[in-house]
Every structure is written in structure tokens, then in C-alpha cells.
Amino acid sequence: MTARHWGAAFDPDELGRLETRMWKAYYRKQPARLFGLLVQAVRAQAGVSWPRAIAGSVLLTKAAAGFSRATGDYERFAPDIVRGYRMLGLPEHVDIEAVARHELRWWVVRREIGLAAGAAAGESITDLYAAIYDLPRERVAEAGRLRGLAAEVRDRGAAADPDGSTGRGAAYWPEVARLLRTSYRSLRRAIDEGAAEVEGVADETPAQRDASVRATP
């Protein structure tokens, strides 16, 4: 299982904090700050070297920047997302093309649905996590739902704020930060539980495995 080898050791509170700061930088049009935070977040989650974190972030930023200016034909950004994820050292059995599709999809649903996109974005994020971590969708559904909800809270808050996306956002950013922290805690818990199950199976003796098979109806 992927969780035993890749991206299993991140600090969920730190990752939530970094993503909150990334979103603020994105909406406040601070590209240099956004890139620096993305490099930190990639390194924190994937555990890769600084050169790989930077290279992967360059490709993911290129895709995100292109998407932000686009009005259609969004699939053309998938190749850069694929290359970006490939730099992060995902295991060979992970379908990186599928990972990129799910990553891009949650960007697209927010663009197409608008302020009510939280649930649809959460579904796409759930698919993304299931593909990356090789876990059943139901294990990571809560993490996906909460991150999608965080995006909707941000979008609705900014829409209602007289200062728009570039303002302080005191009415909504604290809730966004809380949802992202809770989302990453849920994801980390799902990864840890999945890894523990795999280790438990690996530690079983042949006799125990045979007994389990015989006990299965």
C-alpha cells in the first residue's frame, strides 16, 4: 500500500497552515509567496528533497497559472500536473495519469459550479486521495469533504466581503484554516489506519492467515 512508503509522515496541522497561507497568497495575487509556500507544502507532504520539491512545484505552478487564465480546454494542463507529481516520487503502481485527472477535476468543478462547488470539489479530492494513497474512497471521504468545504467557505466569504478576495477576510479565513487542519488530520488518520492494517496482515503467521481464510463465509 502506498501509505507505507509515500507521504505518510506529514504533520497535518503544519500542512493545513501552509495550505491556508497558500490560498491567501493565491487570491491576493502574490505569486512569489505562493511558490515558496507550495515548495514547503510539497516537501512537507511528500518528504522529497528540496530540488525535487522545487522542480515539482514549478510544474504544478505552471499548470495552475495556465488554468487561472483559461476559459476552456482545461485538459491541456494535465501533462504538467502529471510531470509535477512524477517529480514527487509516487510509487510505480500509482496511476499518475489518474492522479492528475482528479487534481485537475477539483479545480474545474470550482470554476464551473461556483460558490456551491464544495461537495463536488470534495468528491474529486476524495478520488485524488484514494488514487495517491491506494486507499478505499470511504476511508478518505471525510478528508476530501472537509477540504472541499474549506474551498466553498473561502469562496462564499470572499464573495460577501466588501474587500473581495484581497481583503483580510477576518470573517472567513479562521474557519477555512480550521477546516483544512481537520481535513489533514482525517487524512493522516486514514493513512495510519491503512498502514497498520497492512502491517498486521504482514505480521500474521501462515497458520493465522489460513485460519482467517477458513473463517471467511
Regions found by a protein language model. Name each.
Residues 23-27, 65-69:
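Hydrophobic/aromatic side-chain positions at a characteristic register within alpha-helices
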Residues 4-12, 40-47:
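Solenoid-like repeat scaffolds
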Residues 42-43, 82-86, 177:
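Amphipathic alpha-helical segments of tetratricopeptide repeats
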Residues 128-217:
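Glycine-rich, aromatic-bearing surface loops/beta-hairpins
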Residues 11-19:
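Generic helix N-cap/helix-start motif at coil->alpha-helix transitions
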Residues 82-162:
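Extended amphipathic alpha-helical interaction segments
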Residues 36-66:
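Short, charge-rich amphipathic alpha-helical segments embedded
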